[in-house]
A protein has these predicted regions:
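Short catalytic/metal-binding and nucleic-acid-binding patches
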Residues: 1-177
């Protein structure tokens, strides 16, 4: 078994910023129907494992989540189930056997409130950053529109003003093909 480097940290009652990418950064989630299925699985499985999703975005070759888990040990079960079910779906759909869909996931414990909101904003602008849309509100596979509809454009603009985005991209999580 390969050990993740750095090792995952599973803590109870903790908020995390998560990034997961497809194997070799391939755009496997490349249709609306596939993205809809992955977003459905994400929401359904998070409920089963007591994972509270604060914000998320799903792109054709990676996703980002901002979440909280009550029991740290549930996080590994959540990702195992999400990645297993989504890979099975995609491989069945495309009639491919035993293809590796996901590479790994990276987690980071949220340090403080500012860290939370900066990553909240980063998630919501990610589809624009990677060129999948010109406006955040036009991208369907994100919680941005949900927050916009619930809280209004002034609230969203204030989030971005108070906690500007920092580009967290490193070479290993640069998802440009």
């Amino acid at each position: 078994m390969t050990i993740h480097r750095p090792p995952h940290v599973y803590l109870d009652d903790m908020r995390y910023f998560i990034t997961a990418g497809t194997f070799r950064k391939k755009c496997l989630w490349n249709t609306k129907a596939k993205l809809q299925r992955l977003s459905f699985l994400l929401c359904e499985i998070s409920g089963r494992y007591n994972v509270n999703l604060y914000a998320w975005v799903i792109l054709p070759n990676h996703y980002h989540l901002l979440l909280k888990t009550l029991r740290g040990e549930d996080l590994v079960k959540f990702f195992r189930k999400l990645h297993s079910d989504s890979a099975s779906y995609l491989n069945r759909l495309e009639d491919v056997r035993s293809r590796q869909v996901w590479y790994q996931y990276w987690d980071r414990c949220i340090r403080n409130e500012k860290d939370f909101w900066v990553r909240f904003n980063y998630i919501h602008q990610n589809a624009v950053k990677h060129g999948w849309t010109e406006k955040m509100e036009d991208y369907e596979f994100s919680t941005y529109k949900e927050y916009l509809d619930k809280n209004g454009p002034e609230w969203m603009a204030d989030c971005f003003r108070r906690c500007p985005i920092i580009d967290f991209t490193t070479e290993e999580d640069n998802f440009q093909e």
